[in-house]
């Protein structure tokens, strides 16, 4: 039998060993804490280095801001395809952002201000207001050194490096010439339906059309309008319905933009195609109506080429090259007879072109 003293000695040794183990664990914990702290410092340093490297990479990459008049119509998506193709061809990143309405001046100003803060390489824009957008765009170019290119629109100022657009008045006159060919000397009442009163593009087309119809003083032609449906197809449809009730002898319709054309098409279809109808900016949903002759003729812009050329000019300015101050992109007349020809499809379906 072991003595109590021996047991106490054994217990003492056991306690001593336990103390050593505890102390060892404490040391290991301290070591682990130090290792964890060191690991965290290294990770933070690496993350900071990566963030700096990424920022430098983004700066070197060069971003071109492209701001359409709105994102409301298919037309602007075709413009976007053109801008992105130019970016791809020249090695630039395109940031395409727009508002939901083509009358949102404050929203478009905010987009420009955001792009200025980001320090983009250039701004390509279709201004919603040719006067209201002047201060912020002038600030971008003259105070921050960001070149400004106007795309499919107008700015009542001379500082932008270049403007790439359809000549809207000429496009309207072209439509008027086609309408005269269709109606002949007999003439008749023609309704002109536009989008927003005061809009530069649509207003130019409407005025060009009216100028052409009336230039020879032909009393056989009577212009009704322009009427404004805000580019909304249902409002435009209602306008045309009211016009037909008040003017059962209405012979023809000219619509000035994509939304107006979509709305007028609803009314023309209800009339069984009895009206002569020329539509500006036909979208993909209207192509079959052109094939069927419900839309007698359509005046198509080339949004892909407008977007591509405007972006290309921005890149040239960035690279120190000279660009043309004003570039007019021609329109194309589309009918049932030519809609499926390759050169027409290249204008109407730019998605397919970019994928070839």
Describe these PLM feature segments:
Residues 14-24, 51-356:
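A residue-level marker of the well-folded mature domains of exported/periplasmic proteins
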Residues 27-40:
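Positively charged n-region of N-terminal signal peptides that target proteins for export
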Residues 39-48:
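Bacterial N-terminal signal peptides
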């Amino acid at each position: 039998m072991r003595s109590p003293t021996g047991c106490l000695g054994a217990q003492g040794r056991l306690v001593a060993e336990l103390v050593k183990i505890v102390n060892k664990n404490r040391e290991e914990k301290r070591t682990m804490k130090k290792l964890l702290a060191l690991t965290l410092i290294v990770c933070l340093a690496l993350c900071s280095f990566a963030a700096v490297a990424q920022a430098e990479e983004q700066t070197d990459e060069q971003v071109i801001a492209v701001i359409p008049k709105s994102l409301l119509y298919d037309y602007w998506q075709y413009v976007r395809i053109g801008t992105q193709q130019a970016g791809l061809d020249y090695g630039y990143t395109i940031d395409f952002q727009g508002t939901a309405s083509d009358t949102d001046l404050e929203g478009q100003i905010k987009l420009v201000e955001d792009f200025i803060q980001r320090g983009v390489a250039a701004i390509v824009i279709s201004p919603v207001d040719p006067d209201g957008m002047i201060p912020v765009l002038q600030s971008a170019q003259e105070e921050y050194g960001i070149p400004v290119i106007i795309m499919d629109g107008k700015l009542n100022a001379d500082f932008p490096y270049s403007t790439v657009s359809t000549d809207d008045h000429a496009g309207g006159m072209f439509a008027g010439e086609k309408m005269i060919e269709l109606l002949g000397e007999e003439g008749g009442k023609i309704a002109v339906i536009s989008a927003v009163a005061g809009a530069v593009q649509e207003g130019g087309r409407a005025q060009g059309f009216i100028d052409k119809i009336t230039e020879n003083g032909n009393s056989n032609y009577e212009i009704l309008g322009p009427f404004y449906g805000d580019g909304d197809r249902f409002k435009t449809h209602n306008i045309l319905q009211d016009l037909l009730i008040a003017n059962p002898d209405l012979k023809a319709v000219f619509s000035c933009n994509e939304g107006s054309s979509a709305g007028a098409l609803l009314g023309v279809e209800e009339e069984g195609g009895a009206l002569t109808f020329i539509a500006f900016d036909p979208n993909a949903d209207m192509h079959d109506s052109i094939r069927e002759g419900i839309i007698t003729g359509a005046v198509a812009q080339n949004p892909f080429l407008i977007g591509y050329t405007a972006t290309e000019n921005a890149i040239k300015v960035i690279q120190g090259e000279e660009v043309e101050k004003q570039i007019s992109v021609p329109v194309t007349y589309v009918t049932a007879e030519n809609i499926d020809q390759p050169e027409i499809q290249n204008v109407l379906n730019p998605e397919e072109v970019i994928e070839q």
